[in-house]
Structures are given as structure tokens and as C-alpha cells.
Amino acid sequence: MMLHSGYQSGGDNPYNYNPKGATFGIGGVARLHLSDHFRTGFEGYFSTLGLKKDLVKGSHNKLFWTGILADWYWKAGRFYPYMGATVGGGMETAYYMFEGNSHDWLPETNTVFNKQPFFAVDPFIGCDIAVGEALRLTVKADWLMAIRKTGLNRPHGPRIYFGFIFAH
């Protein structure tokens, strides 16, 4: 399990609205060691950018992505630095409430909900730290590139992950 935080900016929407700010999320990874230095597996994450600063509270931009990963790692004592990439797919969900009240059950007229699938390429670099026989703490940084037919999807930006994994 890994928790993450990062910064997203930019927007692909017809409203000239540029969502930006801190994003937070959770996800996980499973890896299979194929050699002394090469691993493959899969990972998946949710990341949410709350937009209550610019829009009505409850507005958000969510990213979900998952895919197949491959990474190259080294062992240096109890440290396992690695670098690799994940290739897969995901969905961006944008909910923009430009005016109104998110705490009532009344219909809001100036609200937008949009979902956009994307092809995901996610290069990353990180380090696992062995703290026991089967437990490792991990720190990782990435930059998710969400690609659609029209080009690179936004918002995008870096994320830092902290978490733990079990190893054999």
C-alpha cells in the first residue's frame, strides 16, 4: 500500500478553468522478480485534487490509473533503489461546481461532470528500504502522462509516494 501526494496543474476543458494544487491518493503495487535486477508486475492508484479553493466545495479532479510495470533495481545493503515505468490506462473524472451549495439536495444548474479515458505512461524512480525479513518501506516519485487522441491530457504533475510492501 502506498499513500501519495503531489502537485497537478493544467486543464483540458472548454471553460478556460485551470485546476491546480495539491493532490492526494492511495494505491498499491505487486512485483515479481524475474532476475537479480529485473522485476515486472502491476500497480494501480487513485489521486484526487480538491478544488474547493477556486470552485464550490466538493468540486474535484480525480485520476485513476493502472497498468503493467517493469523496473530495474539494485541492492545496496538494505536499500533497493529502482527505476522503471508503468504502461496502462486510466480515467480522469472532473466535477466542477461553479456556483451553488454542495450541502443541499437541490439541483445545481452551473455544474459539470466529465469522464475521459486515457492511455497511461508513468515513469518512476524510487527506493525500497528493508526493515525486516519480509517488510520494506518504500519511497517513490513519478510523473503520470495521461495520453488521449488529442495529445497529452492535463492536469498532470509530479507525485511522491510513501508506503510499505511485503517481499519474499
Language-model features: locations:
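Transmembrane beta-strands of outer-membrane beta-barrel proteins
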Residues: M1-G6, E43-Y45, G84-G88, K140-D142
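Short glycine/proline- and aromatic-enriched beta-strand/turn motifs that initiate or cap beta-hairpins
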Residues: M1-L34, R39-E43, R159, G163-H168
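Extracytoplasmic loops and strand-loop junctions of Gram-negative outer membrane beta-barrel proteins
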Residues: S9-N13, K52-K53, W105-T111, M145
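Gram-negative (and chloroplast) outer-membrane scaffold detector with strong preference
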Residues: V29-W105, F119-V121, I129-L135, I165-H168
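Short, surface-exposed tryptophan/glycine-enriched loops
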Residues: G126
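C-terminal/domain-terminus segments
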Residues: K140-A167
